[in-house]
């Protein structure tokens, strides 16, 4: 029995579970042969994946470093402390908690620490670029709290901060949320701070989409202006899938330690925390600044070329990694566009646009992001080609010869910019 147990834990995945091994290999091939334009996705380094797939997955470590409920935590303590130190240094924060399993968990911990059921929260409408956890009725944030939503202006499709201020003065929320999932413009955190102070509200920045750009100094930082900041550690930060909470005030930050554990989670995922530490270390390197600048430059080229081809872009452009196509300009739905680009090995997602007449299951938009392909080495010239492939496919959806040409151009682009060199 002992020999059989040892054999099972030392067997390679291809031997112990060929079905899963085969599916993982198929996914690896898909990533290598498709153009990944989902704005919330990126490609981590092999070092990040090695940390996440390590023996740390075996270790339980409830509590904080040096305050655990389990023994044998001396090494995971050191790893978690390193992740915390790197997060604080990268973002200029006084306090950090690296344990949240996701961005949604990080947001929930903030609500648990600062609010009572029935309190009023104010965030951007989901259809205008907000997030489910910012008060959507299908999310716990929309069930536990009174929710007031702000949105963009119809003409500019950008935020009008005076309109946000007037809404806050009227509703007097306990918490204001800024930071979005489909807003392509720079966020004025200082203006939000002024509004929050005027109405006596806490200010939460959910910078999940722009964290990498903030870390690199390519987008203004919310740290100095907000009471608390949450983020994911993937997307533009290019780490593992997970969450992070940051504060400018260490004493205030300790509220969230208790809200994470034992308030909303049990044992932290120390293998993921190790991977977060690796990614945060990578983001502290000069190369990450160059990468983030390229992400924005590529997005602006993508938005510009798409518009040149006659397809409207929400707000007329972008300041970050996001480009949101308004397909009403060509009489197409997001659902159809998503299927069309998928047929030529381009991965994106249908998305609502401001004042969308379609349902969230159909939508009038297609959301694109440049972070993942920039990781592969795509530059402005390559993204101009990507824009043309997308436009050709959407503008002539019935033309099979155009479809075949698009598939070949995608194949050539993937060949020019290989993903992972060496075996995984």
Curated annotation (Swiss-Prot):
It comes from Prochlorococcus marinus (strain MIT 9303). It catalyses: (6R)-5,10-methylene-5,6,7,8-tetrahydrofolate + glycine + H2O = (6S)-5,6,7,8-tetrahydrofolate + L-serine. One of its GO terms (cellular component) is cytosol. Homodimer. It is found in: Cytoplasm. Keywords: Amino-acid biosynthesis, Cytoplasm, One-carbon metabolism, Pyridoxal phosphate, Transferase. GO terms for molecular function: glycine hydroxymethyltransferase activity; pyridoxal phosphate binding. PANTHER family: SERINE HYDROXYMETHYLTRANSFERASE, SERINE HYDROXYMETHYLTRANSFERASE 1. Belongs to the SHMT family. The record marks 234 as: Plays an important role in substrate specificity. (6S)-5,6,7,8-tetrahydrofolate binds at residues 126, 130-132, 359-361. It comes from the Bacteria. Pfam families: SHMT. The gene is glyA. Its cofactor is pyridoxal 5'-phosphate. This is Serine hydroxymethyltransferase. The modification N6-(pyridoxal phosphate)lysine is found at residue 235. Its main location: cytoplasm. GO terms for biological process: glycine biosynthetic process from serine; tetrahydrofolate interconversion. Pathway: One-carbon metabolism; tetrahydrofolate interconversion; Amino-acid biosynthesis; glycine biosynthesis; glycine from L-serine: step 1/1. The keyword Transferase applies. Its EC number is 2.1.2.1. Catalyzes the reversible interconversion of serine and glycine with tetrahydrofolate (THF) serving as the one-carbon carrier. This reaction serves as the major source of one-carbon groups required for the biosynthesis of purines, thymidylate, methionine, and other important biomolecules. Also exhibits THF-independent aldolase activity toward beta-hydroxyamino acids, producing glycine and aldehydes, via a retro-aldol mechanism. InterPro entries: PyrdxlP-dep_Trfase, PyrdxlP-dep_Trfase_major, PyrdxlP-dep_Trfase_small, Ser_HO-MeTrfase, Ser_HO-MeTrfase-like, Ser_HO-MeTrfase_PLP_BS, SHMT-like_dom.
